[in-house]
Amino acid sequence: LIIFSDEIYDRLLMDGVEHTSIASLCPDVFCITLNGLSKSHRIAGFRVGWMTLSGDKSRVKGYIEGLNMLSSMRLCSNVPSQYIIKYALGDYTKTDDLLLPGGRIYDQREYIYNALNSIDGLSAVKPKAAFYIFPKIDAKRFNITNDEQFVLDFLREKKILLVHGGGFHWEQPDH
């Protein structure tokens, strides 16, 4: 068993929520944890990231050898950008003011959450992390039978890009 954990949003938490790394919950299981600066530091174009291997490595030596071979053959890190990691992660305990009341990310989350829930036929759970919200749409009220077609029509008519629920393996056309 190998656990892959994408923890790119580990520092974008609000409302007192704390991140727990999957690897910390199962120290005897081999885990590959992926992370980076693109989300937490809002520098998407930098493409600065890393992969951490933890847990029991005794049964995955060949797999790790393959990862090392692949990384030495195919990866070409952006060396100047790699220098920023040490400084960006320097004070991991500091709360990002943008995630607190009055901060831009917090206030945007509040605005979009309240705006969506004020529209008849739409509802959403308030997100506790990241930049995304997954609203539920009353498919019968809005006559939606295909969520992919709905977002394409919405893009054409309103010039607003959405991602349909099916893009997240949601089976009903209501997200």
Task: Place the predicted regions along the sequence by residue.
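Conserved C-terminal alpha-helix-loop-beta "cap" of PLP-dependent enzymes
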Residues: 121-124, 136-175
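Short N-terminal helix/helix-N-cap motif within the alpha/beta-hydrolase-1
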Residues: 13, 42, 172-173
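Conserved core segment of the aminotransferase class I/II
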Residues: 24-103, 113-115
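Proline-centered loop/turn at the N-terminus of a beta-strand
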Residues: 1-2, 30-32, 161
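Active-site acidic short loop of glycosyltransferases
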Residues: 27-29, 121, 129
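Conserved glycine-rich beta-strand-loop-beta hairpin in the small C-terminal domain of fold type I
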Residues: 82, 86, 102-113, 124-138, ...
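Short beta-strand segments
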Residues: 4-7, 35, 50, 126, ...
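Conserved PLP phosphate-binding loop immediately N-terminal to the Schiff-base lysine helix
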Residues: 1-21
